[in-house]
Amino acid sequence: SHPAGFHLCDERCAMPGTERFGDDERREVMEVLETGILFRYGHDDLRRDRWNARDMEACVRDYTDADYALAVSSGSTAVACALAAAGIGHGDEVIVPPFTYLATIEAVLLAGGLPVFAEIDDTLCLDASGIEAALTPETKAVLLVHMCGAAADMDPILELCRERDLVLIEDAGQALGAWYHGRSVGLFGA
């Protein structure tokens, strides 16, 4: 459990990403529903000084030492936003892992890109050799998913992306709390 109140994987889950919720989470959801305000912005006079999204963003920033954190509706939306911000569009190839949540692939397709599978390693994440083997002249980005609480081997991936001028987008939705050489995953990419 994080000091600010959100829970990482504990005895209630078999692995990160499979957490179950209990009485604490039910109470928190009901408190939000009782305000009648489900949106991040506005309705200041009605929210009874509850700023759940803003507080969660601050908590994530503090925990990961990130400069910014912005809550969106889902991991799918987060990946779609990152691809759009990276300028991924029609015909751009994006290297993705074959072991991932379907939203990884859907987000690339939504952006107009073409997902290209690359091999994963024992961490269940992409690795540099798998990425390199899948590269073509149309490759514009690598969408790296840190799976099941594991951090990918980032140094060789970062080096490859720099050498090939590839945008690196990290999906750390299944690995909040995972670190690589003292840095939170999700903070290495674009």
Regions inferred by a protein language model and the residue ranges of each:
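PLP-dependent aminotransferase-like
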Residues: 84, 88-172, 179
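Conserved PLP-binding active-site segment in aminotransferase class I/II-type PLP enzymes
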Residues: 1-76, 80-85, 89, 162
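Residue-level recognition of oxygen-bearing side chains
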Residues: 77, 153-156, 190
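Solvent-exposed polar/charged
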Residues: 31, 62, 133, 159, ...
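Structured loop/turn residues at beta-strand edges in well-structured enzyme cores
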Residues: 64, 89, 137, 187-190
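Conserved active-site segment immediately N-terminal to the catalytic lysine
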Residues: 170-190
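Active-site phosphate/pyrophosphate- and oxyanion-stabilizing loops and adjacent acidic/basic residues
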Residues: 58, 155, 182-183
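Residues at secondary-structure transition points
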Residues: 47-51, 73, 99, 126, ...
